[in-house]
């Protein structure tokens, strides 16, 4: 009786593998596209039963080749909010997901998939309801449209279907994402490379470094996925963030002070970090002005109603642990 994880060599998928392994789960089929061969590193320390290319997997899954499947965690997608090829995005994120959903419903396999806070666009209300969903780019639209497909399927579904709208996830195993890696990752790399961190300046009424996001540690994301795995009677679409909006300045300062703590140096205030030259700002990119989420904050009411009671790591806790992991991995 296997568990299947798509996007298994990716950021969240590989952390989910680790969380499953810690539970003693090893009968896992990992599915991904290893065209970028370096991503094998995210699989190298995981215990799995098999690996399949994402295209080979699709047909075999539809045929029921894998016998009894305990759950399918669908984490595979193009996650770039800057991707402009709509045909590629819709085929990879929407059509592929639709095929997996249809097969899962036919086979009676619990289907837990990655949605995104990008569906909310520039709104100020982040609640799982149609009137608040206004994506700003084709990535957000691909996630939005699949969520609509799921909403239509849920009333007739005889097996679990869960969509988790990830907010700004950060943590280990994301370095392959390049520009799409988290703010915390880029702050750490800038500090190590240049001796300082540089953030976006003022935009949309927000001061330099003052844009607000809901940053959530990847370990918490894995735990929420496993909560729904443990409760297959619960279905729906749920926000997955910390429930708190924090500024980019706070992320940068958490990174700076985590690195300083590891070097037995005292913490700095934001003003001290700026005055010492450890933190600076650059002009907000013109190319992002029309499609940038300046503020996100997950409404967790539905998630709590679904029985998830654990606290989320604070930004300072999560970033400190992440910086220690990055230092060990250097």
UniProtKB/Swiss-Prot annotation:
Keywords: Carbohydrate metabolism, Isomerase, NADP. Its EC number is 5.1.3.20. One of its GO terms (molecular function) is NADP binding. It catalyses: ADP-D-glycero-beta-D-manno-heptose = ADP-L-glycero-beta-D-manno-heptose. The keyword NAD does not apply. SUPFAM superfamilies: NAD(P)-binding Rossmann-fold domains. It is an enzyme of class 5 (isomerase). NADP(+) binds at residues 11-12, 32-33, 39, 54, 75-79, 92, 143, 169, 177. The keyword Isomerase applies. Pathway: Nucleotide-sugar biosynthesis; ADP-L-glycero-beta-D-manno-heptose biosynthesis; ADP-L-glycero-beta-D-manno-heptose from D-glycero-beta-D-manno-heptose 7-phosphate: step 4/4; Bacterial outer membrane biogenesis; LPS core biosynthesis. Substrate binds at residues 168, 179, 186, 200-203, 213, 292. Contains a large N-terminal NADP-binding domain, and a smaller C-terminal substrate-binding domain. HAMAP family: Heptose_epimerase. Homopentamer. Belongs to the NAD(P)-dependent epimerase/dehydratase family. HldD subfamily. This is ADP-L-glycero-D-manno-heptose-6-epimerase. The gene is hldD.
